[in-house]
């Protein structure tokens, strides 16, 4: 879903694409415009990036080709949030090809949930946490004051004391 003058870009992969679309609606409440992108395969995007990189290295006289990801995200100032129902390392594969601030959300750890909704909240890949990550990325770029982000987080019911999902399995 393209958005002219987007403040942030959201990448959703698999079932989490729906959460990214919901996050876009949540962000509207805070006057934040978001583009939503679907990543059907971070593996293929990485391979394309490596292929283009190799081609450029082998042809220094013609080394200006860009990978598909670089073409899509050529504006280096717009934060990108990638969310997937795989481990974060899955979406981290394209980090070298994104020059913008890049934040990844994934299901690292051991989940113990009775529903998909609870599982996505547990791993922080639901629409609320995608929104939180987008708001934080914009805060780091000085789009919001500390007071504003605190108010946004209260409204989103962000629990700063929630344990890291990737460490919960070993806690007693």
Give residue spans per PLM region:
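Thiamine diphosphate
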Residues: 1-172
